[in-house]
Amino acid sequence: MNRSRLISCTALVLALIAQNSFAGGVALSSTRVIYDGSRKEASLTVNNKSTTDEFLIQSWIDDANGNKKTPFIITPPLFKLSPTKNNVLRIVNTTNTLPQDRESVYWINVKAIPAKSEDAEAKNVLQIAVRTRLKLFYRPAGLKGNSMDGWNKLQFTSAGANQIKVENPSAFNLTFNKFYANGRDIEKTGMVPAKGSLNIELPAGTGKVSEVKYNIINDFGTAGDMLTQRVN
């Protein structure tokens, strides 16, 4: 193995080690946040499970397009997290302009930046900042129930040879966990917006779809029961 290739391989290995170490060090208290509109704020806890490493934590909220101008503020936006410690991020709605007949969805971003280590610098270890992005669902105060109240109301229609259109008449944003078309596992699905629709691309050769089987992710971030529906 020549020198340049050895250096490249070493850098890759060190990067993976640093990333795995970080991934095992910082954790969030949930995989999604439901903001109850009847409350003043929502919260998310950041935990540093490492016994040795310190991290700089940066947080912000944006929309699906990455626009940081949103109705929410998150505090603290920047702080140090010592080994084995935790801190609570607080999310506050600053306006009254959000729709009251359906959920709104935004994104919480949490970036953990490893603190500089003299030992790591001496060994030329590449330390990597990793960002976690999770959904923030704003649920208006007058909206009763939860996401599982809408999962069996989804409507499916054929939208050409390689597409299925999914319509969601409910007031809840519904994210698929598993989705099968004619028994075929469809990996790329996504979220059906509240009172909106989503087109799902099917792999070539799927053929005419007569029924789908699916489940969705509930308020706790876990998968619900499977349901079979016909495709019109």
Swiss-Prot record:
Kindly list the places in or outside the cell where this protein is found, as annotated in its UniProt entry: Periplasm
Keywords from UniProt, A to Z, are: Chaperone, Fimbrium biogenesis, Immunoglobulin domain, Periplasm, Signal
Q: Which residues constitute the signal peptide according to the record?
A: 1-23
Q: Source organism's superkingdom?
A: Bacteria
Q: Which GO terms describe its cellular component?
A: outer membrane-bounded periplasmic space
* Gene3D superfamilies (alphabetical): Immunoglobulins (2.60.40.10)
Gene Ontology MF term list: protein folding chaperone
Task: Please name the GO terms of the biological process aspect recorded for this protein, alphabetically.
Answer: cell wall organization; chaperone-mediated protein folding
Q: Which InterPro entries match?
A: Ig-like_fold, PapD-like_sf, Periplasmic_pilus_chap, Pili_assmbl_chap_C_dom_sf, Pili_assmbl_chaperone_bac, Pili_assmbl_chaperone_C, Pili_assmbl_chaperone_CS, Pili_assmbl_chaperone_N
What function does the entry list?
Required for the biogenesis of long polar fimbria; binds and interact with LpfA.
Assigned protein family: Belongs to the periplasmic pilus chaperone family.
Q: What protein name is recorded for this chain?
A: Chaperone protein LpfB
Question: Which species does this protein come from?
Answer: Salmonella typhimurium (strain LT2 / SGSC1412 / ATCC 700720)
Query: Upper taxonomic classification of the species?
Result: Bacteria, Pseudomonadati, Pseudomonadota, Gammaproteobacteria, Enterobacterales
